[in-house]
Amino acid sequence: MSLELSTFIPIIKELVYHISIDDYASIEHKGQNGDILVEDLAEVIHWYPYKIIPSPDEAFDLAESCFIEEKKSLDVYIPFWTKEEGRSDLMLALSCYMNDASSLVSLLI
């Protein structure tokens, strides 16, 4: 079984949107924070000097992914976009997987 990044684009876009509007409660409610405390995520984003914006389609052309056979997941590394910079040097690391025909993502690192 292999997973394709295209399966997860809508849910990744939604996750980045919630980050861009500082809605960490939604991320936690959906269990997308993985082992990361949403308070820690919020603090990192708060101290980043630029404003995160929703991911454009171009971000997914630049994403790197790797299928992890043991976990049956797709680890994805995708650049954030900011209002000031466009493509940012800050990356989002996610683990993407399927559960009962639903696509799910959770933050890595």
Indicate residue ranges for each PLM-predicted region.
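Surface-exposed, charged secondary-structure patches
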Residues: 45-89
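Central antiparallel beta-sheet cores of small beta-barrel/beta-sandwich binding domains
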Residues: 15-19, 34, 58
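Short, well-ordered alpha-helical segments enriched in acidic and aromatic residues
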Residues: 21-34
